[in-house]
Structure formats: structure tokens, C-alpha cells
């Protein structure tokens, strides 16, 4: 038995401007070198860009985008008897949200363009329409899980 205490989940404080925990998660994942004000500026201007491009509520678009990118299953490597198997496992809710936010930000960074806020806004808009690289990443993950379904009985 492990002697460590169980992982403590902490309550997520909503951001002061939009009062949305999802926006807070976006800000925290964009964060680099502890410069939260810069990441807030990037996310808030991305939300403003979304609001200018689409006449819907930008928070609903962000929520839809993150929901569309959440994977149902993922691949985990499991070493059994000297060989490593790619075992498909279900994704828990919090991990799914975290993965989807990470993928959206990762693929926003590698998009062509100058400002990160524009690239993030475009990636979120594409993800809300089931397009873009983050959706492709989710589909690739699902294909890998389907291909390795034979090893599902090795689940953790």
C-alpha cells in the first residue's frame, strides 16, 4: 500500500472578468514563466476576437470547442512480460478537459500568424465547428485506441 496521502483536489477560482472556471483553466494553461497577466491578456483578447467574428456568446463557443475536443479514450503504455502494449483506457472528466485545453493551446501555438490571441481564437472557432488540428488529434487518438482494442483487457 502506498503511504502517500490521496491527491487533494482544490477548488478552482473563477476568473474575475468572465467568472468562468473554463476561462481560468485556459489562462492557467497558457501561462508561461509565472506571468499570469500576459496569459490573461492573451485569453481575454482571444475571447474578444471570437466575439467580433461570431455573433454568439464567446463563452459558449469556448465551451463547445473544449467539449468537441475531449477524447473518450486514450492510449497508455503498459509493460507486461517484457513487451510494451498500447492499452486503451477511458478518460476521466477532469483529465479530458485538461487534455482538450492542452491540445487546443498546442495547436494554436503552431498555427501560422503573429499574435497568440488570434491563433488561439481561430483554433477555438475551428474546434467549435469540429474542424482544426485539435479535432484531428482527438480522432487520431480514437483510431489508435480502436486499433489496440485487443489489449483492452490489460487495463489498469
Swiss-Prot record:
RNA-binding found in the keyword field: yes
Q: Name one GO cellular component term.
A: small ribosomal subunit
GO MF annotation list: rRNA binding; structural constituent of ribosome
> Is the keyword DNA repair in the record?
no
Main location group: plastid
Cellular location(s): Plastid, Chloroplast
GO biological processes:
translation
What keywords sit in the KW lines? Chloroplast, Plastid, Ribonucleoprotein, Ribosomal protein, RNA-binding, rRNA-binding
Question: What PROSITE patterns has UniProt attached to this entry?
Answer: RIBOSOMAL_S7
Q: Which family does it belong to?
A: Belongs to the universal ribosomal protein uS7 family.
How would you summarize the oligomeric state and partners of this protein? Part of the 30S ribosomal subunit.
NCBIfam families on file: rpsG_bact
Q: What is this protein called?
A: Small ribosomal subunit protein uS7c
Species this protein is from: Cyanidium caldarium (Red alga)
Amino acid at each position: 500500500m502506498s503511504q502517500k496521502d490521496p491527491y487533494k483536489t482544490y477548488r478552482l477560482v473563477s476568473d474575475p472578468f468572465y467568472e468562468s472556471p473554463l476561462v481560468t483553466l485556459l489562462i492557467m494553461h497558457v501561462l508561461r514563466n509565472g506571468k499570469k497577466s500576459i496569459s490573461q491578456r492573451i485569453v481575454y483578447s482571444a475571447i474578444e476576437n471570437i466575439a467580433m467574428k461570431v455573433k454568439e456568446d464567446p463563452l459558449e463557443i469556448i465551451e463547445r470547442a473544449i467539449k468537441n475536443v475531449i477524447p473518450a479514450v486514450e492510449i497508455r503504455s503498459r509493460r507486461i512480460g517484457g513487451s510494451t502494449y498500447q492499452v486503451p483506457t477511458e478518460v476521466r472528466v477532469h483529465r479530458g478537459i485538461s487534455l482538450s485545453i492542452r491540445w487546443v493551446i498546442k495547436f494554436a501555438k503552431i498555427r501560422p500568424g503573429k499574435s497568440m490571441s488570434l491563433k488561439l481564437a481561430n483554433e477555438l472557432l475551428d474546434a467549435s465547428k469540429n474542424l482544426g488540428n485539435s479535432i484531428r488529434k482527438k480522432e487520431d487518438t480514437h483510431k489508435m485506441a480502436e486499433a489496440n482494442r485487443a489489449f483492452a483487457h490489460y487495463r489498469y
